[in-house]
Amino acid sequence: KELRENRNIQMERVDEGVLINFFSETDRNLFDESSGDDLALSDYGLMALNSVGVLLARYNLNNGKGSSIEITGHTPEGVDDPWSMSAKQSALVFDEILKSGVQESQVVKIIGAGDSIPLDAEKPGDMKNRRFEILIRTKPEE
């Protein structure tokens, strides 16, 4: 229920499996801006990520076949060192999903995409571009 009511999380089936997008907004930032150089998830970011923990654990089992997980971090245009920032975001999300029962061996990619893939090319600096994606790959990569 919590996941369905969260307007900042979008889940969709894709050819590879299930893609979960987590978006920041002005009033709901996924990351704690007051943490200085030590990047941290905000309380909202932790709640959003924890709301999919059960789903991640379910795909972890996948009828004994398991599945792989890819994490991609994104930043809006105008962030200092967007590649480094987005890589740090992905690593932070990785650390948190391990706490939810995901096995380290399941996470096959941790990607920092910087500001190279804005949601809306017309608004590359929009807060929604400060986001991360989790791909639960249920089909092997070709």
What residue ranges belong to the model's regions?
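Periplasmic OmpA-like peptidoglycan-binding domain that tethers envelope proteins to the cell wall
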Residues: 21, 36-44, 48, 70, ...
